[in-house]
Amino acid sequence: MLARHHHPIVAIATAPGRGGVGIVRLSGQRIAPVVQALCGRKLSPRQATYLPFRDAHGQIIDKGLAIFFPAPHSYTGEDVLELQAHGGPVVLQLLLARCLEAGAALDPATGQPVLAQLRVAEPGEFTERAFLNDKIDLAQAEAIADLIDASTETAARSAARSMSGEFSQAVNTLLEQLIHLRMLVEATLDFPEEDIDFLQQADAQGQLLRLQATLASVLARATQGAILREGIKVVIAGQPNVGKSSLLNALAGAELAIVTPVAGTTRDKVSQLIQIEGVPLHVVDTAGLREALDEVEKIGIQRAWTEIESADAVLFLHDLARHDATENPLYAINYIADDARLQSALALKLPKNTAIIDVWNKSDMAGPELLRQVNGGVLISAKTGAGLQALREQLLRVVGWQAAPEGVFMARERHVSALRSVQIQLLTAQNQLQAAVPALDLLAEDLRQAQLHLSSITGAFNADDLLGEIFSKFCIGK
């Protein structure tokens, strides 16, 4: 631990602004003297006590509840004091200042500060203390932040499961199996003179295959959890006036974007967070793609391409009404040719893993013959809502969402990356094990690297810069 981890800390634990209740939290080793100074009495452990909070001159700041959690039975593993007052910003700032003042006051008996080095906590420092004191592991700490930031009910429930340790338990089960396999390899290396084939006797190949199968299951659930956490960026693209804004409004269930018959109405992006089956989607409506008629439209089209290139999925809208060649064949031919050019441009600009869904809009205006000619994609009417459910289902399929919500771990990209690295190391280990003459030293190294990657998920193996990055993302007071 660093020296700062031994300093007592205090912070306002509730969100900024006005509220019915606000909390000031203090954590440190042996904080009983400052508890006495702040509360004017000794508090019974883990019992809420209603009392006045007074300043250094005895004047009442507020009245509320004080709860003392002696170590190690607290959130941080240290002594913790929580002061629950009315949630006004001024009241909470006064209580925070009073805590710092009480800690800095000199003890008449010793002439030393009552609570030396008491300071305001850094973002995430209470949760960091919980991790350092083995109250939670790193995956659980991250799940706490993910629960706070969850944008859908499904994401919140998945984060709660990870916070309770389901993800960590799955990782630890993998670690136990991996360590046992490593022991067999190391025993074979350490005792080559023994007339015992430890690997064959213990069915090392079978153990490795079972480990790989378990890993694949955990990785699949974690990948779905990463989708829940990060969300999916969906960009609506196409020529002007094909119904992009109408589609955004239909998906969002609200009139977010202006809809007019005039081509080029949308000049800048319009974004909205929606959810499909609990999966958060960041849907972006963009300017129509064509040769710009003025400088403002040109900027809007450039921004549209920027959004498209960073999308996880692109909904490319076709206007079925303009495909009808019965009234104006030349207009329809030109429109279809422009659509084809835009589709080619999309294919060239976008990464291969970006999903492109052809969406045929205005199906309510197309005749049966034209509808029969549509090959691939999804038929919809943004105006009537026809086909929207099929579009939602297609969106989830193309981005890889397939797990039942109750089976999903809330996971981060670093977790998924670590699990994939383990998968690669185990595949290399499998090749070594199946060789005619296995290179046991290389096999042992593959398994060691796999263990390091797994351990990084829960923090059993970590780097200080990784910890700093993770906990800095928390709010102050958590």
Curated annotation (Swiss-Prot):
Keywords: Cytoplasm, GTP-binding, Hydrolase, Magnesium, Metal-binding, Nucleotide-binding, Potassium, tRNA processing. It holds the Pfam family MnmE_helical. This is tRNA modification GTPase MnmE. One of its GO terms (molecular function) is metal ion binding. Residues 231-400 form the TrmE-type G domain. InterPro entries: G_TrmE, GTP-bd, GTP-bd_TrmE_N, GTPase_MnmE, MnmE_dom2, MnmE_helical, P-loop_NTPase, Small_GTP-bd. (6S)-5-formyl-5,6,7,8-tetrahydrofolate binds at residues 25, 82, 135, 478. Its EC number is 3.6.-.-. One of its GO terms (cellular component) is cytosol. It is found in: Cytoplasm.
